[in-house]
From Swiss-Prot:
Protein name, UniProt field: Uncharacterized protein HI_1599
Pfam (any one): NGO1945_C
Domain of life: Bacteria
InterPro entries tied to this protein: DUF2063, DUF2063_N_sf, NGO1945-like_C
Amino acid sequence: MLPKSSLKETQQALANAIRLGNADPLNGYAASRLAVYTRLVRNNAFGFIDRCFVEAPLHIEPEYWKNAKENFVQNGNAHSPYFQDIAGEFLLFCQEKEIFDTNILALMDFENTQLLAEVSLAKVPEKFEWNRHSVMQLSGAAYLKSYDVDFLSSDFKQFDDTPIQAIIWRDSDFRIQQQILSELDYWLLSYLQEQPNSLENVLSALNTMVEDSTSIIPLLEQVWMKWVTSEVIYPEQR
């Protein structure tokens, strides 16, 4: 059996060889075995990345995208042992290294948020009862985002220099949805994200913040109903 220090050194050397794609023999490891490990790591990492980021690569030269993934494997630091987190690790790496421009990074953040909604452990109820006094919460599978660029209005075809606020969520049928939010939408959903509450209490809070809320109240009630129907807000889960 190898001494512990020697074993650690061998493991580190093997990891470095796989990272760098170095297929030279290493401490008894045949070049063919190293090549298999190297391909396996890249196939898994690249596969998870490409399944998450579908739209962003369409705005990038293929070779540049390929090089970014290789750069990540060679130089990135893993903060999570789970495969489903690889895409998020890649996004963080690209953000820290400023590998792509801010528009691309914003779109990548959006696509990664879609993945987060998909794999969220939150249970979205298909049916529920509520009334104006029911304490309601923002769905645990919903994410509020703000971006300095609009790629949603064009269905990801172009980047418009217009700030947007958006929501990405998963419904009870496990469909991932997204929508640009109005200021009233964003205010209501942000409010419920911070503190679950009833419609009556939210309306009362609105009265204390706005001098004359008469015209806003019916709009807020419509917005509330819209998000209840969309399964974005539902009775608080404890």
